[in-house]
Every structure is written in C-alpha cells, then in structure tokens.
From Swiss-Prot:
The gene is NS. The dsRNA-binding region is required for suppression of RNA silencing. This is Non-structural protein 1. Belongs to the influenza A viruses NS1 family. Keywords: Eukaryotic host gene expression shutoff by virus, Host cytoplasm, Host gene expression shutoff by virus, Host mRNA suppression by virus, Host nucleus, Host-virus interaction, Inhibition of host innate immune response by virus, Inhibition of host pre-mRNA processing by virus, Interferon antiviral system evasion, Isopeptide bond, RNA-binding, Ubl conjugation, Viral immunoevasion. It comes from Influenza A virus (strain A/Camel/Mongolia/1982 H1N1). Pfam families: Flu_NS1 (PF00600). It is found in: Host nucleus; Host cytoplasm. One of its GO terms (cellular component) is host cell cytoplasm.
Length: 90
C-alpha cells in the first residue's frame, strides 16, 4: 500500500511513463485482490500507506530527495513486468 501511494504521487505529478502508469493500475487491482484473499480491510491499509507518504513529503524539504524517495520503486516495476508488457509498443 505504501509503495502504491508513492507511485501514485509520481503519476499525479505526470512523471510516469506509459509502462509505469500501466503497472500502477495493475497494482491497484492486485491490492484489492490480496485484501479480499487475506481478509484485510484494504481501505485501512491504503489509508495508512497514504499517511506515511504524506508525512515524508511534508517533513522533507529537499525536492531532489523527495524525487529520489519517490523513484525508488520505479526500478522494481520493471522487474515485475511481464514479457507481454515489455514487448508492448508504448
């Protein structure tokens, strides 16, 4: 949930490319599925993740550091991509 909110912030600032945005949408569906499978309240979990991201962004004044923190999961989404996604003409 935390990483999803970090990615969402990047997308909201229009810094994500097409594969990044596609991954964000799939992650959102995946979170819903995992929540129901595990019997978790996904709204509570995503709210907690959002609060963590907002606190980091509020407390950190260095813009470059904010972007570094926000881009950390970006390398992970590439490794999680399927062959179909990698071969897609974006």
């Amino acid at each position: 949930c935390f990483l999803w909110h970090v990615r969402k912030r990047v997308a909201d600032q229009e810094l994500g490319d097409a594969p990044f945005l596609d991954r964000l949408r799939r992650d959102q569906k995946s979170l819903r599925g995992r929540g129901s499978t595990l019997g978790l309240d996904i709204k509570t979990a995503t709210r907690a993740g959002k609060q963590i991201v907002e606190r980091i962004l509020k407390e950190e004044s260095d813009e470059a550091l904010k972007m570094t923190m926000a881009s950390v999961p970006a390398s992970r989404y590439l490794t999680d991509m399927t062959l179909e996604e990698m071969s897609r003409d974006w």
